[in-house]
A protein has these predicted regions:
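Juxtamembrane helix-loop junctions of ABC transporter transmembrane domains
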Residues: 23-24, 31-44, 65-112, 116, ...
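Helix-loop-helix
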Residues: 51-60, 150-164, 234-307, 312-313
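Transmembrane helix-loop-helix hairpins at lipid-water interfaces of multipass membrane proteins
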Residues: 12, 18-75, 79, 152-157, ...
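Pre-NBD coupling/linker segments of ABC/ABC-like ATPases
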Residues: 317-330
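An intracellular "coupling" helix at the cytosolic face of ABC transporter transmembrane type-1 domains
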Residues: 10-16, 101-105, 121-130, 134, ...
Length: 581
C-alpha cells in the first residue's frame, strides 16, 4: 500500500479533475435514478388516468434528464481523461528519469525487456484503470445503493429482495477480485519474457539465420507464448465466472421481484406502475454491477501493473555521488588501481581479482587477454559504471567515489565495444560529445578518427543516420563513435575494443593520429589484437580475472607466457623455431 501511495502522489496535480470527474458521474447517476420514478408516474397518473398532457409533460422531463445526463457524462469523461492521461505521462516520466539514474548493476538486475514493458504496457494499463475508476468507482455503487433506497420508498417488502441480492453479489465479485490479482502479475511477467525473446531474435536475426537456428528459436518463442497463453486463459476463465454468476443472481432476484410484486398488486398494496419502477431499478443495478465487475477486473490489472512500476521506482540507488568538487593532485598519476576486486551482481565469482597498476598522464595503456578475462570490467570501473567490492580506483589521485558525477564523466571519454549511434544527422550525433562543437571541430575529430572520408561519402554532416546506425557498416559506426568521444577532449580516453571492425591499416592510422595529438590524454586500449596494443607504454595482460603480466611488449615477450601465447597465435611466423619445437 505504501508503494501505491508513492505512485499516486502524481494525482495531487490533478486533484480538481479527480474530484470533478466522479462528481459529474454522480450527477449523471442521479438523473438515471430519477428515470424509473418518472416512468412510474407516466404509467400511474398519465396512462392510467388517460391524461395526455401529463404524459407529454413527463416526456419533456425525461428528455431533459437525458440531455443533462449526457452533459454530465461528457464533462466527467473529459475530466477523467485529463487526469488519467496526465497522471500516466507524469508516471512514465518519473519512471524514465529513475531508469536514467540507475547504475549499470541495477539495470543488469532489472533487465531491459521488463523495463520496456513497464514503461509502455504497464503504464497504459494503469492509465486505463484510473480513467475507469474516476468514472465508475463511485457512480456504480451510488446507483446500486441509491436504487435500493428508492426501492424502499416504493415498497419495503419488495426492497428486501434488493437487500439480500446486493451483498451476495458483492461477495462473488470481491472473491474473484482477490483471487485474480496475483494472476495478472504472472501475466505481465510472462509478457516480459516473451518480449525479451522477441527483441533478442529481432536483433540477432542474421546470426540466427547464419547458424540455421530458426526452428529452435521458433520453438522457444512458442513455448513462452504458450506459457503466456496459459496464464491468460487462467485469468480469462476466472474472469468469465463474473458475468454468469452475477446474471444468475440478478435473474433470480428479478423473478422473485416480479413474483412478489404480482401478489402485492393483487392485494392492492402497490400499483402496477410501482412494480415497473422496481423492475427498472433492478435493471439499473444489473447494468451497474456488470460495469462494476469489469471495473474491478481492470483495476486488478492496473494494481498489478502499478506494483511492477513501483518495483522500479523504489529501487534504492546504491551508488551515491558527492556534490562538492574535489581537489586533485596535479602530480598524481592519471589512474591508479589498488588491489581492486569486483564481481557482477549474482555472478558469484569475481570478474577481476586484486588488480593493481598505475597509468601516468599521457601514457597509452593496452589491455589484452582472452574472451571473458575481465578486460572491459577494468575500464568500466574508471568512469565508475560499477563500484568495486574491494580496493580503490583513483583518477588524478582522487578516489572515483569522491568525484561528483558530472566532474568524473567530463574527464573520461568512453567508447564501448558496441558502437551506439542515434537516429538523426551526423552532426547531431557528434554533438553528443560537445554540444556547442563547431563544424571545424567536428571535422578535426573525424579526421583523427579516420572517419572524414566516410562522412564526405555520405554528403556531409547533415547526412541522416538511421536508428542504431542501420545504414552504416560496423567499421563506419566505430569510427564515428571514436570521433564523438574525441570531441569531448577527455583527460582519459577508453577504447573498449572499439576498433575491432577496422582493418589493420586503418587501425594503425587511428592510433598514430591519437598519439600525435601531443596532449596529456591518457589512453586505454582494450583489444584482442596484439598489434593494436604493441606500441603501448604499458600492456596489462589478464587471464581469468587476474593480472598475469604488466610491462612493454618486449618485456612481456620475455617474461609473460600468456602474452607470448596470444602474440604467437596471431603472428606464428615470428615464433622461434625452438619455441615451435
Amino acid at each position: 500500500m505504501k508503494k501505491q501511495k508513492m505512485s499516486l502522489k502524481h494525482l495531487k496535480k490533478y486533484q480538481k479533475e479527480s474530484v470533478l470527474a466522479p462528481l459529474f458521474k454522480l450527477l449523471e447517476a442521479l438523473m438515471d435514478l430519477t428515470v424509473p420514478l418518472v416512468i412510474a408516474q407516466i404509467i400511474k397518473n398519465g396512462i392510467g388516468q388517460n391524461d395526455m398532457g401529463f404524459v407529454l409533460k413527463m416526456f419533456g422531463i425525461l428528455l431533459l434528464l437525458a440531455v443533462l445526463g449526457m452533459a454530465f457524462s461528457f464533462t466527467a469523461q473529459w475530466f477523467a481523461a485529463k487526469a488519467s492521461t496526465g497522471y500516466a505521462t507524469d508516471l512514465r516520466q518519473e519512471l524514465f528519469d529513475n531508469i536514467q539514474d540507475l547504475t549499470y548493476a541495477e539495470l543488469d538486475q532489472l533487465g531491459t525487456d521488463t523495463l520496456i514493458t513497464r514503461m509502455t504496457s504497464d503504464v497504459l494499463q494503469v492509465q486505463t484503470g484510473l480513467n475507469l475508476a474516476l468514472r465508475l468507482l463511485l457512480r456504480s455503487p451510488f446507483i446500486v445503493f441509491g436504487a435500493m433506497i428508492v426501492a424502499f420508498t416504493i415498497d419495503v417488502k419488495s426492497a428486501l429482495i434488493f437487500v439480500v441480492t446486493i451483498p451476495v453479489l458483492a461477495i462473488v465479485i470481491f472473491t474473484i477480485m482477490w483471487i485474480s490479482i496475483p494472476l495478472y502479475t504472472k501475466v505481465q511477467s510472462a509478457l516480459d519474457k516473451l518480449l525479451g525473446t522477441l527483441r533478442e531474435n529481432l536483433l540477432g536475426v542474421r546470426v540466427i539465420r547464419a547458424f540455421r537456428k530458426e526452428d529452435a528459436e521458433v520453438q522457444q518463442f512458442n513455448q513462452e507464448n504458450d506459457t503466456l497463453t496459459q496464464y491468460n486463459e487462467h485469468v480469462g476463465r476466472l474472469s468469465a465466472l463474473m458475468n454468469p454468476l452475477t446474471y444468475i443472481l440478478i435473474n433470480v432476484a428479478i423473478i422473485t421481484l416480479i413474483y412478489v410484486g404480482a401478489f402485492r398488486v393483487d392485494g392492492g398494496i402497490i400499483a402496477q406502475a410501482d412494480v415497473v419502477a422496481l423492475y427498472n431499478l433492478m435493471a439499473l443495478i444489473i447494468v451497474e454491477l456488470i460495469k462494476l465487475s469489469s471495473l474491478i477486473i481492470t483495476i486488478n490489472k492496473s494494481l498489478a501493473s502499478l506494483e511492477r512500476i513501483e518495483a522500479v521506482l523504489v529501487v534504492k540507488r546504491e551508488m551515491v555521488y558527492p556534490i562538492e568538487p574535489v581537489k586533485e593532485d596535479a602530480s598524481a598519476p592519471a589512474v591508479i588501481f589498488d588491489q581492486v576486486s569486483f564481481s557482477y551482481p549474482q555472478a558469484g565469482a569475481d570478474a577481476i581479482s586484486n588488480i593493481s597498476f598505475v597509468a601516468n598522464r599521457g601514457e597509452t595503456i593496452g589491455i589484452i587477454g582472452g574472451t571473458g578475462c575481465g578486460k572491459s570490467t577494468v575500464v568500466q570501473l574508471i568512469p565508475r559504471f560499477y563500484d568495486v567490492q574491494s580496493g580503490k580506483v583513483c583518477v588524478n589521485g582522487v578516489d572515483v567515489k569522491d568525484y561528483p558525477q558530472g566532474e568524473l564523466v567530463a574527464k573520461v571519454g568512453m567508447i564501448p565495444q558496441k558502437a551506439v549511434l542515434f537516429e538523426g544527422t551526423i552532426r547531431e550525433n557528434m554533438q553528443w560529445g560537445k554540444e556547442d562543437a563547431t563544424d571545424e571541430e567536428i571535422w578535426h575529430a573525424l579526421e583523427i578518427a579516420q572517419a572524414a572520408d566516410v562522412v564526405r561519402s555520405k554528403n556531409g554532416l547533415d547526412a541522416m543516420i538511421e536508428q542504431n546506425g542501420r545504414n552504416l557498416s560496423g567499421g563506419q559506426k566505430q569510427r564515428l563513435t571514436i570521433a564523438r568521444a574525441l570531441l569531448k577532449n577527455p583527460e582519459i580516453l577508453i577504447m573498449d575494443d572499439s576498433a575491432s571492425a577496422l582493418d589493420f591499416a586503418t587501425d594503425l592510422k587511428l592510433r598514430r593520429a591519437i598519439h600525435n595529438l601531443g596532449n596529456q590524454m591518457t589512453v586505454f586500449i582494450v583489444s584482442q589484437r596484439a598489434s593494436t596494443v604493441r606500441a603501448a607504454n604499458q600492456i596489462l595482460v589478464l587471464d581469468d580475472g587476474n593480472l598475469v603480466g604488466i610491462g612493454t611488449h618486449d618485456e612481456l615477450m620475455e617474461n609473460c607466457k600468456v602474452y607470448q601465447e596470444i602474440y604467437y597465435s596471431q603472428f606464428p611466423e615470428e615464433k622461434p623455431k625452438e619455441v615451435m619445437a
